[in-house]
Amino acid sequence: MIHKKTPENTITYNNLQLGTLQSANAFNPLKINLFYKDFNTVIILDNRLAEIFKIDFNTLSSYKDVSHMSTGHDNTIWVFNQNLQKLELFDYKSRTTRAQTVPVQNAVLDLTSNYNSCWLLTENYLYQYNYFGSMVKKIENKVISNIEKNDNEDQYELVTENEAIRT
């Protein structure tokens, strides 16, 4: 269940048919992304929490088994396709893949993005990609467990067991 509170009222979105919400991304408040992993579905909401797009990856001609999702630029989302072990930049309006990475050899721990970059955290590496899907950086991972965005800043923290490292 998603709530949006304003001084005047509270707006709620809930989709019981899709089960448990795996992740929500409100980087762009005009296109809020909700990922329901159990049903392999992404819902795009507008700023009033009205459903504007529904992407059911089970019904696409090129089936995708998505394990992680994050916001992209324009009408795209970043998805990690478990079947191919690839990160993909997916255009949800045209229902096509704009970019694909080479297969990732390790288990994926986290995925986050902004308009310019996407970070894919695996057991052994942290990968950074630009908005075209080209790898910019590959850093060995020995202690990072997830990536968190600072609320008031355009920075990310790499979270370890004992501390947070700013990027």
Q: What residue ranges belong to the model's regions?
A:
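Surface-exposed, polar helix/loop patches in the mature regions of secreted/periplasmic/lumenal proteins
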Residues: L34-K93, Q100
